Amino acid sequence: MKKLRIGVVGLGGIAQKAWLPVLAAASDWTLQGAWSPTRAKALPICESWRIPYADSLSSLAASCDAVFVHSSTASHFDVVSTLLNAGVHVCVDKPLAENLRDAERLVELAARKKLTLMVGFNRRFAPLYGELKTQLATAASLRMDKHRSNSVGPHDLYFTLLDDYLHVVDTALWLSGGKASLDGGTLLTNDAGEMLFAEHHFSAGPLQITTCMHRRAGSQRETVQAVTDGALIDITDMREWREERGQGVVHKPIPGWQSTLEQRGFVGCARHFIECVQNQTVPQTAGEQAVLAQRIVDKIWRDAMSE
């Protein structure tokens, strides 16, 4: 089988910490090149990772079968549109675009072009979350908290909902089966319109779902708790599993070989996209799944603005 030619757009902090270590460990693909509009900053990064620097987005597209996009959210629509129109498959950081209409237009464009367009919701590929999903058939309650130590501002409410709270909503809805309805919730902002706190309630049949985030909680902790028929399961920071059944408590150790990037789902996410392109299969977070959580976050924001 011909090796897939992979490219990267955007070389900021997330790309360097989470994606380049995975993509540079190429096995059944080749890392062809990278492009960023800030050439002066991009060149040293490309040199340290031994990745060729492309002179333009179009030249990168011409040399690649698929591209990972890690540029700013504001650039997503233009960058992804250009790549899709050039016949290139795309995996892009969430959110798909900075507004819902543009996100839906990108999904429609990918469908017309018969190309793979996937949103990189890495938590869907975190091994412990994947294991939890298989044990929720009898769940009565599912709660996900993702807090920040001190991250109020400088962006407005809409930006923070789309940039960070989106992860919580997408993960919780995916764990529940993705067919939940929004029942209500609370949003608190400061006088500058910056998000302080969010908590929302959903239902999926008998299952009750809660999502929660505080921007100045003094902690970066992320937890998921499931209450099922016969068990209480807690997952902390995607690496600690605590399960109670009757009188017994079970702590599942993380495999020694498992890297932090694998625990957090980045490895699984990248490989899933590449395998879908190679095998011409549909990714988990393509089509409707690519915009499901964004559509709900957009409604949460619109409801808050109308109050």
UniProtKB/Swiss-Prot annotation:
Its EC number is 1.-.-.-. The keyword Oxidoreductase applies. It comes from the Bacteria. Keywords: Oxidoreductase. SUPFAM superfamilies: Glyceraldehyde-3-phosphate dehydrogenase-like, C-terminal domain, NAD(P)-binding Rossmann-fold domains. Signal peptide: none annotated. It is an enzyme of class 1 (oxidoreductase). This is Putative oxidoreductase YceM. InterPro entries: Gfo/Idh/MocA-like_OxRdtase_N, Gfo/Idh/MocA_oxidoreduct, NAD(P)-bd_dom_sf, YceM-like_C. Pfam families: GFO_IDH_MocA, YceM-like_C. Coiled coil: none annotated. Belongs to the Gfo/Idh/MocA family. GO terms for molecular function: nucleotide binding; oxidoreductase activity.
